[in-house]
Regions:
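Compositionally biased, intrinsically disordered low-complexity regions enriched in proline and serine
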Residues: 8, 119, 129, 134, ...
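N-terminal pro-sequences and low-complexity stem/linker regions of secreted or lumenal proteins
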Residues: 452-875
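Bacterial N-terminal signal peptides
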Residues: 8-19
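Intrinsically disordered low-complexity regions specifically enriched for long asparagine
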Residues: 9, 397-399, 629-632
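A generic structural signal for short, non-catalytic loop/turn and secondary-structure boundary residues
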Residues: 15, 42, 430, 549, ...
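N-terminal secretory signal peptides that target proteins for export/translocation
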Residues: 1-5
Length: 875
């Protein structure tokens, strides 16, 4: 095993680029900051309180001392109540003459927690602070709790509809008198009006025609068990109305009782619906920008602030006219591409300051909004990873920020092992990011500029530092330093695979930073992966930007995962016994798409030809039907005969189809300049009886990759081609550096030969490299800021072709009914990526390869917050 070290830059790079490209590893830095796998870093302001899995909403008690935080992650969902601190009054006796009132500071801490079976974003106190209301999501209820000095006592739920109907209550708003509650039903495409005293839903206002949108995906409380049942579930899922372009996905509610209005942000449409409370009908729709989510209303009701997650902006609506008074740019740079993901807002008690949570930038933007229409930026406050909720205490002294993915890095070599029951499942990557609450003291009086100046500087320092100037990159580097400059590489073939870590594939290579004890598929199983890594350039410091496949394919194709995807995949993966949450990405829902589209949109815009082989393409409605896509930009640009995700279909046959197309292109004299190829079988089907064994699946995937590279390298296009290979995510495989570290390959006549490149790269680095080669504009802040893969290339081409290594194991080996984990695998759904429980699946794969008596070692992870002591339960 080689421990990573910083390497000198090769000679083909200009000397000024050397320091910028030195190897780095995610985790704690000497200066106290934390480097994330995506090349951003953290240095949060204030005090931090550890929380649970993916906190998404903070409700501050009217009294100001306590705050309730709702958690809606993949794991157990809950509400944690935090004593936000501040000051408490204490009277010192003056023996009856001069009693003295002393204000003493209160330590901030978590004081209680209650489990919630299922929830989605909605959380609100009653005006008197005696009750807390919480969305019941798939249970189709509003949870009710009595609140007393930080303690929550569950009360009977308020039913909104029958549990068989799909509404999914989301954002909540409570009337000033505490008698009525409004709930946006995000999948029901409606808003409910609730009589709290009567515990009754008075009616639903639909923003689109009711019908199949309110149905379950499958009318069963059990996951689909057979291939036929799973296929039916997927077909029903794809046919649901919410995937239609006009589905609004109502998200948040904001009451304006003096005007008799309810404002509802429509997540999938760039507008806010204005509901007349008297008639309970939509009176108007006010334009915002893409992905409106949380709102904040001034005390006078004159101005409504709306966060637009897909556009880095906040729309300031004049409620007297329904028009935008101004648009605030919340990103670090006004000209920044999408990626800041503003998803929460808070106004100071005097309505002069606006705080905007930028989930993608890990900071809070601060604006002076004393005069709406003439607002100005005051600066930024650095916080933790992916802030999801920002609130100001009623006295205006403190800012509370829920950080969805935590604060810092920590290895867990002695942590619980996957495959065990109970707490062992905390090691699954979807639950590895316990959040944190940042409590930040705000400046008093006029000290804003002085307080914000160092915070703003830190916020800029936490963003990826600017890449090398064009002059710093050697002129003969095949990767241009800027879009529009020439490259000897004309064609990019982008191969996407499924869910593996670096150590699982390449941990046995002594020249790389690997751990051979964690290598599940060594050279005997993956001879082509090993041969490619040694003949070309070994990348041992590459990280995927995603957590699971739902966001992984979005990151891999769009350099971004939207607010919708990040907030819905945990429910689809971890809370879907009712089958109410469809798989949220890969072109199923228009609301999931990034504002600037995907890489094929950039290619079309630049006049670059492109073609997809199985990516963002689904099988026909019936067996034998041609493939289809819901994305207009892919119509006419995908192979209708290339087999989509189906683990019963060999990757070598997919490779054969691609090679047949390649031969056709050779005959025609030209091929698409950008080709995206999906080879998914390294996902494996576990030990499902009758399915290929994990070893056979991996060997099939390996041979398919080798054959594709062989065919391309022996073709007429090879001298001008670069092949890029990555995994969409790393899904909790063992890795001794980080759970996001993943195998990646650059294969080209211009790729370095027999070299090791330990530069820190990410999914977005690979996208950025292809963009520079093809002359495509970046899609988001993340690929725009990512480190291009300059060091993986060399100036002089080496045209030697690649010859695929034959399989060394039986590709037709099948699981038996007595294989370890066969019973568990039989129950898994393998018709779609990640439909199976990845924690159990990884244990099954490990024991299948290493032996039934060999437990899987725990993975290590960096740049994340790990399990912290839970706050005390109620006695």
């Amino acid at each position: 095993m080689r421990i990573a070290a910083r390497h000198a830059a090769p000679l083909f790079l200009a000397a000024g680029l050397t320091a910028l490209l030195a190897a780095d590893l995610p985790g704690l830095r000497p200066d106290g900051s934390v480097l994330l796998p995506n090349q951003w870093s953290l240095r949060p302001a204030g005090n931090q309180i550890p929380l649970g899995d993916f906190p998404v909403n903070v409700a501050v008690h009217p009294g100001g001392r306590f705050a309730a935080i709702l958690h809606c992650g993949h794991g157990p969902q809950e509400i944690i109540v935090v004593d936000a601190g501040g000051f408490a009054a204490r009277t010192e006796s003056g023996h009856g003459r001069h009693d003295l009132t002393v204000r003493e500071p209160i330590e901030s801490r978590a004081v209680s927690r209650v489990p919630v079976r299922e929830s989605f974003y909605g959380l609100a106190f009653s005006p008197d602070g005696r009750r807390l209301f919480c969305s019941g999501a798939g249970d189709e209820v509003v949870h009710v709790f009595d609140f007393n000095q930080g303690r929550l006592t569950p009360q009977p739920d308020i039913p909104l509809r029958g549990a068989a109907i799909r509404g999914i209550p989301c954002g909540l708003a409570v009337s000033r008198d505490g008698r009525e509650l409004f709930a946006a039903n995000v999948w029901g495409q409606s808003v409910s009006r609730v009589d709290i005293t009567a515990r009754a839903n008075l009616g639903d206002l639909f923003f689109t025609a009711p019908g199949r949108t309110a149905e379950k995906i499958v009318d069963t409380n059990q996951p689909a068990r057979t291939e036929e049942q799973a296929m039916l579930a997927k077909r029903a899922e794809a046919a649901l109305d919410p995937a239609a372009p006009d589905a609004p996905f109502p998200y948040a509610c904001q009451l304006d009782e003096p005007r008799g209005r309810l404002y509802v942000s429509l997540w999938a449409q760039a507008c806010v619906a204005v509901v007349d409370l008297k008639s309970f009908q939509v009176a108007a729709r006010w334009a915002t920008q893409e992905h409106p989510n949380e709102m904040a209303l001034t005390r006078s009701g004159r101005f409504l602030f709306v966060a637009n997650a897909n556009r880095n902006t906040v729309t300031v609506l004049d409620t007297a006219t329904g028009r935008a008074a101004e648009t605030l740019e919340a990103s670090l740079s006004p000209a920044a591409l999408p990626g800041s993901t503003p998803n929460s807002l808070a106004l100071s008690p005097d309505d002069t300051k606006l705080f905007v949570a930028n989930a993608g930038n890990n900071n809070i933007a601060v604006f002076d909004v004393a005069t709406p229409g003439h607002s100005r930026s005051l600066g930024f406050i650095p916080v933790g990873w992916y802030p999801t909720s920002v609130r100001v205490t009623p006295d205006g002294r403190r800012l509370l920020v829920a950080n969805g993915r935590g604060l810092t890095s920590k290895a867990n070599p002695n942590g619980p092992q996957p495959g065990k029951s109970g707490e062992a499942y905390k090691q699954y990557i979807a639950e590895l990011f316990p959040g944190a609450l940042s409590i930040i003291d705000l400046p008093a009086g006029g000290g804003w500029r002085e307080k914000l100046a160092p915070w703003t500087a830190q916020s800029f320092q936490c963003a990826p530092q600017p890449g090398p100037a064009p002059a710093a990159v050697a002129a003969d580097n095949p990767v241009p330093a800027a879009v529009g400059r020439p490259s000897p590489v004309k064609y990019c073939i982008y191969i996407i695979k499924e869910n593996r870590t670096y150590d699982q594939f390449l941990g046995d290579l002594p020249q790389g930073n690997g751990d051979p004890s964690l290598c599940l598929f060594p050279e005997n199983v993956t001879p082509n992966h090993h041969k490619l890594a040694t003949q070309f350039v070994l990348l041992d410091n590459f990280y995927v930007d995603a957590i699971v496949s739902a966001d992984g394919h979005e990151w891999s194709m769009g350099a971004y995962a939207s607010d919708f995807v990040n907030k819905t995949w945990p429910l689809n993966y971890g809370h879907n016994a009712s089958r109410k949450y469809p798989y949220p990405s890969e072109g199923v829902f228009p609301v999931a798409a990034p504002a600037t589209g995907y890489i094929w949109d950039r290619a079309r815009e630049a006049g670059v030809t492109y073609r997809s082989y199985g990516e963002f393409v689904t099988a026909g409605k019936n067996p034998g039907d041609a493939n289809r896509t819901k994305l207009p930009a892919l119509e006419g640009h995908f192979d209708p005969e290339y087999h989509v995700f189906d683990l019963s279909y060999p990757d070598v046959q997919r490779a054969a189809r691609f090679i047949a197309e390649l031969h056709r292109f050779e005959t025609e004299g030209e091929m698409p300049r950008l080709q995206i190829v999906r080879l998914p079988n390294d996902h494996t089907a576990g030990t499902q009886p009758g399915a290929a064994t994990p070893t056979a699946c991996m060997a099939d995937n390996d041979l398919a990759l080798g054959r594709v590279v062989e065919a391309v390298s022996h073709s007429k296009f090879w001298p001008q081609t670069a092949i890029f290979v990555l995994e969409d995510d790393a899904q909790n495989g063992p890795d001794h550096v980080d759970a996001h570290r993943s195998p990646a390959f650059v294969i080209s006549p211009y790729a370095r030969r027999g070299a090791v490149d330990s530069t820190m790269y990410s999914t977005c680095s690979m996208l950025r490299t292809m963009e520079l080669i093809l002359g495509l504009k970046p899609m988001s802040q993340f690929d725009a800021a990512a480190q291009p893969m300059f060091r993986a290339f060399q100036a002089a081409p080496d045209l030697r072709p690649y010859d695929a290594a034959p399989a060394r194991v039986n590709l037709n080996e099948r699981n038996t009914t007595v294989a370890w984990g066969a019973a568990a695998s039989q129950k898994m759904d393998f018709t779609r990526e990640d439909a199976a429980d990845e924690t159990i699946l990884n244990e099954v794969i490990w024991r299948s390869v290493r032996g039934a008596t060999r437990p899987m070692p725990p993975p290590r992870h960096a740049a994340f917050v790990f399990a912290q002591p839970k706050p005390d339960d109620d006695d």
